[in-house]
Amino acid sequence: MEKKLRVGILGATGMVGQRFISLLENHPWFEVVTVAASPRSAGKTYEEAVGGRWKMDTPMPEGVKKLIVKNVNEVEEVSSTVDFVFSAVDMTKDEIRAIEEEYAKTETPVVSNNSAHRWTKDVPMVVPEINAAHFDLIKTQKERLGTTRGFIAVKPNCSIQSYTPALAAWKEFGPKEVVVTTYQAISGAGKTFKDWPEMIENIIPYIGGEEEKSEKEPLRVLGTLENGEIKLAEEPKITCQCLRVPVLNGHTAAVFINFEKKPTKEQLIEKLESFKGFPQEAELPSAPKQFIQYLSEDDRPQVKADVNYENGMGVSIGRLREDSMYDYKFIGLSHNTVRGAAGGAVLCAEALTAKGYIQAK
């Protein structure tokens, strides 16, 4: 790419916004030129607006420190400076739906980390390795919005990234029933232990809205594009419980699964290790070389050892074994703010760029 695409971050001061900024430092295709946040941050430098709330392990990139934060509600002004935006705004769902459409209507593509548009019929919800073909929905969406280049694309919930890739890899064996429990990191709530001390040595057996997302969103990701809309996968039937656990980064899933035709363990592992999709074929900058790794040790995957596999963009599976009630059971692990949030959105933007949906204005 001769000239980098100009990127804006909506909701730049929050945890996911910060993750976008750290991931996009030195990105070969994209450059952060605009940061936008709430009116109370507008007019300050990014460094001032974030203050002591920088939550990343790496220092704040020099290139963004002195950027003046724009008011996210001043859509025309923000849009005029960028080729596309990443959205990580903290608003009500109705407000998010409205503001993301406003940006799209200024002919600015929106790649969103938010859940507001995940069930909008003509908005693709994509894990690029699994369902990059769903980006073709954008043509239908542009007709509705009356745009030529503006659109919205979203990534699914962080909780599903630890097991949905395995379901996709095993598609030919017909996953039929899935029982999953997720053990979710506190960064998924935008928190650290410093600002959520009651999570130390604690487990909370409830995360609002998360179980429904974890049961339904995989069916859209695994669905097929027919006549300008997504036909949801009818199987597997998924039931889920979601727990908040005292871990900073990394969502773990304990999964039981039945198949239409029961494969061997060796077949399942082979499918995991060989699974790849558009990001690997197109050699996108953020794509993991190997999307899913299988770990044969009894005590893996572990958050401390494995959460940063492939820079947090890969998924780790382990403990695959036969079960007395189900065909198999296994453990999955993914990085919830990299693959599950900002990193997954960056990979979507790379895929959209490679496919020609995102271009310089």
Which residues does each PLM region occupy?
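N-terminal Rossmann-like NAD(P) cofactor-binding subdomain of oxidoreductases
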Residues: 1-206, 237, 309, 315-316, ...
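Charged docking surfaces used in two-component/phosphorelay signaling
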Residues: 187-361
